[in-house]
Amino acid sequence: MKKNAVVPFLVACVCYVLPLQAQIPDNHPIHLFQSYITGDFDNSRQIAQELQAGKQVHPYAKHVNRVANEKIDHLPNPLNGFFLLEESYYKYAEGDTIVKPYLFFFEALPEGKVKLYSMQLPKEIAPKDIRNDNPLLRFDYRTLQPSPTFRPAVYTQTERGFYLKAPNEFPGGVFTLEETIGKDRLEVMELLIREGRQITPYNMPIIYERINMTK
């Protein structure tokens, strides 16, 4: 979540569950999706363009995304998708760097789409330890649960990549995640509206570009 934004809560905490496991076909688009979303990305080009225009609008933002299956114990085999550990870093010119780790599960749907689940992070693991380069980091699949405050959402493949728009209502407002995951480029807009007022301090998505190859 960006600076000045507030993490929303849904009216009711619905219990979402991960899907039954199945073998993924070799030609399923999730394999292309995985290659697009895995790696290191930042919006340094976007920031440079904004500064050249006279005003920085977006925070500097960086994602460090890695497939996290090998960090999860008791993982089913076959697995109908993959886990991704995302390290998110955000910094406005006048503020400190905000660090946010996320664990996602992406499910291969039969019709060729990809379903996103945002997972709850175990409370016993300190956020500072949830890093891709932490060799001691372990999750237990048997205790992992999808977040009750983010409704699972579906990416549809388009000419530009994989597109998702996911509104989540909460008391007094709505949080909408809109993304396009493309080759070497991620477009991410997180729009928070509360009591009819826009909290997100910008109207256009953060444009991430790949800055190095996947490890």
Would you name each region that the model predicts?
Residues 32-36, 44-54, 83-215:
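Calycin-type beta-barrel ligand-binding domains and close structural analogs
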Residues 26, 63-71, 168-175:
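Charged, amphipathic alpha-helical segments
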Residues 24-40:
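N-terminal helix-cap/turn-to-beta initiation motif at the start of protein domains
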Residues 8-9, 14, 49, 73, ...:
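Residues in flexible loops and secondary-structure boundaries
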Residues 46-79:
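N-terminal, post-signal-peptide region of Sec/Tat-exported proteins
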